């Protein structure tokens, strides 16, 4: 079987298989701080490492219009820092809570009952008790082509400045 992207239904497939083909697909639980010092925490299913030397990662933000930015993207572009928290099984419920549609400035750490731990190299806190976290400074933002409905994705690339790993997973 061969078909064009986003034409999976015409090929008889009920769901787009791209997300299942490129697997495993880790969740990047992105913590960021706005220029007003508000803290945001949100999960992103399009996240991955890009290189190890220099250490770089990316996450991709879905937008419904060219004029609406999600809080994580807004914060990273304002302050230039973010933390990629790696979600452990113990954090699944909290991660789901943090994916809620909260107003800008609401702290998802508080909504989800999570501990904020100071980072080593940046001002954005990481989630306490995660298996690992990557402290990052913003490197570049890429605006991918928009779809026919005007939505699309914006890719945020960061340089890793410090790596936290829970001793229990080493």
Ranges and model annotations:
Residues 1-170:
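Basic, polyanion-binding surface patches
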């Amino acid at each position: 079987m061969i078909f064009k992207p986003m034409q999976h239904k015409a090929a008889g497939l009920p769901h787009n298989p791209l997300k299942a083909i490129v697997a495993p697909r880790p969740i990047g639980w992105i913590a960021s701080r706005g220029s007003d010092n508000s803290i945001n925490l949100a999960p992103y299913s399009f996240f991955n490492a890009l290189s190890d030397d220099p250490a770089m990662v990316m996450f991709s933000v879905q937008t419904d219009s060219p004029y609406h930015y999600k809080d994580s993207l807004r914060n990273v572009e304002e302050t230039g820092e973010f933390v990629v928290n790696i979600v452990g099984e113990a954090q699944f419920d909290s991660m789901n809570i943090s994916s809620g549609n909260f107003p800008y400035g609401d702290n998802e750490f508080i909504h989800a009952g999570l501990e904020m731990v100071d980072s080593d190299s940046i001002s954005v806190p990481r989630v306490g008790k995660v298996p690992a976290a990557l402290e990052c400074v913003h490197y570049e933002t890429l605006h991918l082509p928009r779809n026919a409905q005007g939505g699309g994705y914006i890719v945020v690339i960061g340089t890793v400045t410090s790596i936290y790993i829970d001793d229990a997973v080493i």
